[in-house]
């Protein structure tokens, strides 16, 4: 009996660490999201800007959060699954010192200390892929 209990606990701890280390898989692909942003942009009025915000993190109790679920509209247009992000879509091309752009995705930077508590973040490099 003790062997079964030990085996059961070992199985639980090993499976939870495997599941928590998995990466995001976007089955739709970046081209799908890019196409949907372009279709949305074509329907926008002239000289307009659209803002899309990620879903908030919902607290279960003082110490735990519910499993995070991204806002479907935000995910549909961006493919981004992490909290604390903003997608800005411009109808017309904008220009700055770096060139032309018509959309901006604001995301959290990588932070090893916070990742220890909140989980892995893709950061700026992950957003550009």
Which stretches of residues belong to each language-model region?
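A composition/biophysics-driven feature that prefers long, compositionally simple stretches
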Residues: 2-5, 9-12, 20-129
């Amino acid at each position: 009996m003790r062997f079964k209990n030990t085996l059961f606990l070992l199985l639980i701890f090993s499976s939870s660490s495997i599941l928590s280390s998995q990466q995001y898989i976007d089955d739709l692909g970046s081209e799908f999201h890019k196409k949907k942003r372009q279709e949305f942009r074509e329907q926008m009025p002239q000289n307009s800007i659209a803002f899309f915000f990620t879903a908030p993190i919902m607290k279960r109790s003082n110490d735990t959060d519910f499993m995070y679920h991204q806002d479907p509209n935000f995910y549909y247009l961006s493919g981004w699954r992490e909290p604390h992000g903003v997608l800005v879509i411009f109808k017309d091309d904008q220009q700055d010192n770096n060139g032309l752009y018509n959309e901006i995705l604001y995301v959290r930077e990588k932070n090893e200390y916070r990742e220890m508590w909140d989980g892995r973040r893709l950061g700026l490099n992950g957003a550009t892929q």
